[in-house]
Swiss-Prot record:
<dbReference type="GO" id="GO:0030145">
    <property type="term" value="F:manganese ion binding"/>
</dbReference>
<feature type="binding site">
    <location>
        <position position="141"/>
    </location>
    <ligand>
        <name>Mn(2+)</name>
    </ligand>
</feature>
<dbReference type="GO" id="GO:0030604">
    <property type="term" value="F:1-deoxy-D-xylulose-5-phosphate reductoisomerase activity"/>
</dbReference>
<feature type="binding site">
    <location>
        <position position="142"/>
    </location>
    <ligand>
        <name>1-deoxy-D-xylulose 5-phosphate</name>
    </ligand>
</feature>
<feature type="binding site">
    <location>
        <position position="117"/>
    </location>
    <ligand>
        <name>NADPH</name>
    </ligand>
</feature>
<dbReference type="Pfam" id="PF13288">
    <property type="entry name" value="DXPR_C"/>
</dbReference>
<comment type="similarity">
    <text>Belongs to the DXR family.</text>
</comment>
<feature type="binding site">
    <location>
        <position position="15"/>
    </location>
    <ligand>
        <name>NADPH</name>
    </ligand>
</feature>
<feature type="binding site">
    <location>
        <position position="116"/>
    </location>
    <ligand>
        <name>1-deoxy-D-xylulose 5-phosphate</name>
    </ligand>
</feature>
<comment type="function">
    <text>Catalyzes the NADPH-dependent rearrangement and reduction of 1-deoxy-D-xylulose-5-phosphate (DXP) to 2-C-methyl-D-erythritol 4-phosphate (MEP).</text>
</comment>
<dbReference type="InterPro" id="IPR003821">
    <property type="entry name" value="DXP_reductoisomerase"/>
</dbReference>
<comment type="pathway">
    <text>Isoprenoid biosynthesis; isopentenyl diphosphate biosynthesis via DXP pathway; isopentenyl diphosphate from 1-deoxy-D-xylulose 5-phosphate: step 1/6.</text>
</comment>
<feature type="binding site">
    <location>
        <position position="115"/>
    </location>
    <ligand>
        <name>NADPH</name>
    </ligand>
</feature>
<feature type="binding site">
    <location>
        <position position="192"/>
    </location>
    <ligand>
        <name>NADPH</name>
    </ligand>
</feature>
<protein>
    <recommendedName>
        <fullName>1-deoxy-D-xylulose 5-phosphate reductoisomerase</fullName>
        <ecNumber>1.1.1.267</ecNumber>
    </recommendedName>
</protein>
<feature type="binding site">
    <location>
        <position position="208"/>
    </location>
    <ligand>
        <name>Mn(2+)</name>
    </ligand>
</feature>
<feature type="binding site">
    <location>
        <position position="186"/>
    </location>
    <ligand>
        <name>1-deoxy-D-xylulose 5-phosphate</name>
    </ligand>
</feature>
Length: 375
C-alpha cells in the first residue's frame, strides 16, 4: 500500500503529541512536515524520531535541525503549498488556527480538524473554501467525531455531551472564587490549560455547539447539550422514528484522532467492556454555567462569535495568571459582547481578524477594571 503523507500543525500541543502516539501504532502514513510555536526541545525530538524533513516555526525562537526550517509571516502557507500533503492534522489551538485551517484546506486532500476557533469565528470562510476545493474535512473533537460516525440525513436532534468540568459538584457560592489549581483538575480528560478552564465554564461546549452547526449544517434548535458525568458517551443522534444512536468509547483522544487519519478504516487500539457501564444525562444549569447560555446571543453572528472567543482568550489567560477570579471570566465575555454588538458582519479573513483584535483590546480593558476592583 502506498504511504500517505501527513503534516501536523501544532505538533507539540496536546492533540499534536497524541497524533504522534497514533502514528507509532499504525502503518501507511509518513510524517513529512510539522509546525510548532516555542517548544524547541520537543520539536527537535520529534524531528529526530520521525525523520521530519520540513518544519515551520511560528514563535520567536531559534531553531536549528537537520530538517528544512520555514520562517516568516507566510511560512506555514509556503510549506503547505510545497508539500501538498494527503492529510493535514490541524492541532493549532486558538484563533491563529483559522489561518492554518484555510491553508490546509487549500493544499491538502484531507483536513483533520482539531481547532474549534476556525469554525466558531470563520465558519463561513471554511465552508467557502470547501466549496472551492475537493477536500475532506473530518472532525477530531470527540463529540463531533461521534456525531460524524452516526449522523443521518434526517435527524430530529443531536446531543453533545459535557463532563461539566472540575467544578461541577461545587456549591454555587464557592465557584466564584475557585483557583486555577481547582479548575485544572478535570474529572475526565487530560487537556491543555485553556480548554480545561473552558470546560469548567462550558465555553468549550458553546464552541462545540457552534462547530456542530457548521459541520453538520444543522439549525441551533436541533442541537442539545447534556451533562454526562461518566465520559463514555460522546455523541447522540435522535432520529424521527424514535431510534437513538450513541457512540460509546473510553475518554481517549487517540480514538477520534486515529479515525480522522484512517477514515473510513479504523485502527486496532483496544477493546471496550460494556459489563459495568452506567450512564446518566443531566440538563445544563444556567446558574452554574452562565457563559454557556450566551450562545443564544451569539449563535447567528460571526462578529459576536469572534468577540466571544477573543474575550474568552483574554479572560482565561487573566484567570490563570491570578488577575481575575473564576467568576470574572463570564463577566469579561458579557461586557465585551455588549461593546461589540452592532458591528457589521465580517466578509473576509481580514475583517474577522480586525474584530478579534478589537474584541481582545476591549476584553483587556474590562479585565484590568475587574482586577482593580477585586484587588
Amino acid at each position: 500500500m502506498e504511504e500517505r503523507t501527513l503534516v501536523i500543525l501544532g505538533v507539540t500541543g496536546s492533540i499534536g503529541t497524541q497524533t504522534l502516539d497514533v502514528l507509532r501504532k499504525i502503518e501507511g502514513i509518513r510524517l513529512v512536515g510539522i509546525s510548532f510555536h516555542t517548544n524547541v526541545e520537543l520539536a527537535k525530538k520529534i524531528v529526530k524520531e520521525f525523520q521530519v524533513e520540513n518544519v515551520v516555526v511560528t514563535g520567536d525562537v531559534s531553531f536549528e535541525c537537520s530538517a528544512k526550517v520555514w520562517k516568516g509571516p507566510h511560512a506555514l502557507e509556503d510549506m503547505m503549498e510545497a508539500l501538498k500533503p494527503d492529510i493535514t492534522m490541524v492541532a493549532v489551538s486558538g484563533f491563529s488556527g483559522l489561518r492554518a485551517v484555510l491553508a490546509a484546506l487549500e493544499h491538502s486532500r484531507r483536513v483533520c480538524l482539531a481547532n474549534k476557533e476556525s469554525l466558531v469565528c470563520g465558519g463561513f470562510l471554511v465552508k467557502r473554501k470547501l466549496k472551492e476545493k475537493s477536500v475532506e474535512l473530518i472532525p477530531v473533537d470527540s463529540e463531533h467525531s461521534a456525531i460524524f460516525q452516526v449522523i443521518e440525513p434526517d435527524v430530529q436532534k443531536i446531543v453533545l455531551t459535557a463532563s461539566g468540568g472540575a467544578l461541577r459538584d461545587w456549591d454555587l457560592e464557592k465557584i466564584e472564587t475557585a483557583t486555577p489549581n481547582d479548575v485544572l483538575k478535570h474529572p475526565v480528560w487530560s487537556m491543555g490549560a485553556r480548554i480545561t478552564v473552558d470546560s469548567a465554564t462550558m465555553v468549550n461546549k458553546a464552541f462545540e455547539v457552534l462547530e456542530a452547526m457548521e459541520l453538520f449544517d444543522l439549525p441551533f434548535e436541533k442541537i442539545d447539550v447534556k451533562i454526562h458525568r461518566e465520559g463514555l458517551v460522546h455523541g447522540v443522534v435522535i432520529l424521527p422514528d424514535g431510534n437513538v444512536k450513541m457512540v460509546f468509547s473510553p475518554p481517549d483522544m487517540r480514538i477520534p484522532i486515529s479515525y480522522s487519519l484512517l477514515y473510513p478504516k479504523r485502527a486496532a487500539l483496544g477493546s471496550f467492556s460494556l459489563e459495568t457501564m452506567k450512564i446518566s444525562f443531566d440538563p445544563v444549569n444556567p446558574e452554574r454555567y452562565p457563559a454557556f447560555f450566551l450562545l443564544n446571543q451569539i449563535k447567528d453572528s460571526y462578529a459576536l462569535r469572534t468577540a466571544f472567543n477573543a474575550a474568552d482568550e483574554v479572560a482565561v489567560d487573566a484567570f490563570l495568571k491570578g488577575k481575575i477570579k473564576f467568576g470574572g471570566i463570564h463577566r469579561v465575555i458579557e461586557r465585551t459582547l455588549e461593546r461589540i454588538d452592532g458591528y457589521p458582519e465580517p466578509e473576509n479573513l481580514e475583517e474577522v481578524e480586525q474584530i478579534h483584535d478589537e474584541a481582545r483590546k476591549i476584553a483587556e480593558r474590562v479585565t484590568e477594571w475587574l482586577s482593580s476592583i477585586s484587588s
